[in-house]
Amino acid sequence: MATSRLPPATLTLKQFMRRQQVLLLYRRILQAIRQVPNDSDRKYLKDWAREEFKRNKSATEEDTIRMMITQGNMQLKELEKTLALARS
């Protein structure tokens, strides 16, 4: 009998799409952090982002995840604004 190659906890389409949103947000945050001129600030922000995403990794509630993505996007926009002001 052939066994399935899928892991026992395969993601639904909705979960898969939400996961992609989270990963994209994480990548965008790390890209923005790379533009921080000060090495210690850059390391602090990178560690902060990593810990925040790790801390919320086990979240499964759809509304909670959506809210965290929204908050993450707002924080990313704030970081990008701050970096733009620092460059000008």
From Swiss-Prot:
Transit peptide limits: 1-19
InterPro entries linked to this entry: Complex1_LYR_dom (IPR008011), Complex1_LYR_LYRM2 (IPR045293)
Subcellular location(s) per record: Mitochondrion
One Pfam assignment: Complex1_LYR
GO cellular component: mitochondrion
GO biological process terms on file: mitochondrial respiratory chain complex I assembly
Record's keyword terms, sorted: Mitochondrion, Transit peptide
Functional description taken from the UniProt entry: Involved in efficient integration of the N-module into mitochondrial respiratory chain complex I.
Annotated family: Belongs to the complex I LYR family.
Designated name of the protein: LYR motif-containing protein 2
Organism (species): Bos taurus
Gene name of the record: LYRM2
